[in-house]
Amino acid sequence: MTFSKEWNLAYKKNLQINNWPFSELISYTIRFSKLKKTKFRVLELGCGSGPNIPFFLSLNVEYFGIDGGTIIINKLKKQYPKLKHNLFAGDFTHEIPYTGKFDLIVDRSALTHNFTNDIKNCLQLIYKKLKTNGKFIGIDWFSTNHFEYKNGSKTTDPFTKNNFKTGQFKKLGNVHFSNKRHLLDFFENFKIEILDEKIIYSKIPSQKKNFASWHIVARKK
């Protein structure tokens, strides 16, 4: 990964700043995690501007977050001083620098901005960092059915595009798109409990462009 300059620049310009938690991450976490367990440890990959932090803190879990953007992590440490030792700026595709293991690791559309080999490497790290029967929840991993898969510049990885000139991926560097077989390969060491594909067509106003992504719940065997 070696965190993209595009994302750090976006954070510096106060772009890609989300103030509200992602509803699907909340619903999948509540539905598929045993949150009543004491001393429940959660790690969020690509925590960004921290929109999901209030949700996890409300559950009285021990929260940790890692993001490649030093700018945004420094802002979060000022916003959440009690978490300053739990927030880390670094490349989570090559290192997850926390001691101990986690009950839950979540990612909302962060890993899906990397090349295949980096994602595979990160999933190996995730597997090692999860407790037995611990779960990984991935939300909005972009699908090859997304209309933008036809756009952008090709790379050496057939599933990864970049240099998007318009749309939601403009100036965001690499974007990874997956199909079912590709995801099954990614999670071959896990037990996949849920694999949902979300495809959205806007009818009012009518648009021919569709959004498509995957939601994944995978358990460490």
What are these regions (language model features)?
Residues 120-132:
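A short glycine-rich, Lys/Arg-flanked "PGG" loop and its adjoining helix->strand segment in the class I
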Residues 109-110:
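Short catalytic micro-motifs in class I SAM-dependent methyltransferases
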Residues 106:
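A conserved beta-strand element that flanks and buttresses the S-adenosyl-L-methionine
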Residues 1-40, 45-97, 118-121, 135-221:
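Class I (Rossmann-like) S-adenosyl-L-methionine-dependent methyltransferase catalytic domain
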